[in-house]
Amino acid sequence: SRTYGPECDYTKVPYDYTRTVMPTNKDTRPGTPSGTAEPTPPVYQLTIIGGFTDAFHFYPVIVRDSIATIYLHNNMLEYGHTYYVTIDNGVLNLADGSFQGVTKEDEWVFTTKSDMPELSDTLIVDVAGKGDFNTVQGALDFIPDFNEQQTVILVNPGDYEELVYTRNKWHVKIKGAGMADTKVHYANNEVFNPHPLTVKTNEWPGTFPSRRAAFMLDNCKDIVIEDMTIATDLKGQAEGLLINGERIALYRVHIIGSGDALQANGTIYMESCELDGGGDTILGRGSLFAYKSNFRNGGGPFSWVRNTAGNHGNVFVECTFSTEDGKQADYGRTKSNHGSAYPDAEFVLIDCKVKNIIPEGWSSIGAKTAKMYEYNTCDMVTGNPVDVSKRHPYSRQLTKDKDTELINNYRNPAFVLKGWVPDSCINGTK
């Protein structure tokens, strides 16, 4: 994992999300700095995704067995054009030496669609090219920034190996065909796409955006994602899904990450979701409400909550938390890697079931002011109430007799999510 330089700090001015035109690889050199960052070194291949000019490292060619898939720089092709493909001798090799490349005389050509689709209320993504776009990123790029019209992106069954980053999108639903049928994934992490050497990322609103997740929503509002799997294929600091936005709803989404598998900043609602990750499974300063969702990690803390005073943190109702037998997990920590604490951090479990959680519940709570609450936690295997006699002294067990109003408030998404009432089975609107 990359470390911060001695002069590295958060940007002193809010990151500028205003733009009238989305920059692309056609008109802007990948690595061109935005915000207060320095240029991204052009040591490896870079591509601009979603208008983020600092750009991303990507894999121009991915080889699996005898199949080589070539990925072009984003947004470079024109509608209604014919292109030819050449591959120099030696770029790709077969064991028997029979492949000598592709020349122009081989006439390997392809033609793009004659024109772009109309901006309608529904766009179709199909990996085989039978829709309006064959990538999720392509459909998101097509939708104007700050669009007030509701747009539905239907993602057909398929394996979408792509790095997704989108900013300034409003009122978009991204709907797959099911967790087992639609998968969006990429091999990305903090080492492959690190933060700038001189700028820290993502701690507070207005700081420099992160580039290390497989799927990133940045400065977005009123987004729904449902019925798909979103995953990173690498270990380390590697989110499957990274959210910076308001009123982001996830339904029946399987998120697979490593450390910081889900980064949640803003207001986020999850229902009937699955999350698999490593330590600090959920990271962020946002308000997250999860209902009937399952959380798994390989041991260690499930969260590193950083919400501030006046904002709720993470609340879980009728969820499960588990790790495999032979390992132990905990609800989370509030202390930073340098020993300081987030004094207003909030992590609340209501009617949840757990397996292989340490007796203390939380590994570290750095301040008595943190709201680490628990009510009616039961064992996933036996169904019996868990033994809470050794819980962390800064945590609190809620009781029906004394805390009925507070328990009921925590069962209400609007209480946690700044008054937002998402579609939800918990309140009969889903």
Model-derived features: positions:
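Acidic, low-complexity Ser/Thr/Gly/Pro-rich repeat segments typical of extracellular/periplasmic
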Residues: 1-117
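Sequence-level preference for short, compositionally simple segments enriched
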Residues: 114-130, 134-430
